[in-house]
Curated annotation (Swiss-Prot):
Organism domain of life: Eukaryota
Major place of residence: secreted
Family the UniProt entry places it in: Belongs to the pleurocidin family.
Subcellular compartments: Secreted
InterPro entries in alphabetical order: Antimicrobial12
A Pfam match: Antimicrobial12
Protein name per UniProt: Chrysophsin-2
Tissue expression as described in the entry: Gill.
Species of the source: Pagrus major (Red sea bream)
Record's keyword terms, sorted: Amidation, Antibiotic, Antimicrobial, Cytolysis, Hemolysis, Secreted
Listed GO biological process terms: defense response; defense response to Gram-negative bacterium; defense response to Gram-positive bacterium; hemolysis in another organism
GO cellular component: extracellular region
Length: 25
């Protein structure tokens, strides 16, 4: 369960980071 949670958190963080980077560009 923890592994899935961490994996989901990392995936969400990457998505948010990409979105911010895309918006800044």
């Amino acid at each position: 369960f923890f592994g899935w949670l961490i994996r989901g958190a990392i995936h969400a963080g990457k998505a948010i980071h990409g979105l911010i980077h895309r918006r800044r560009h």
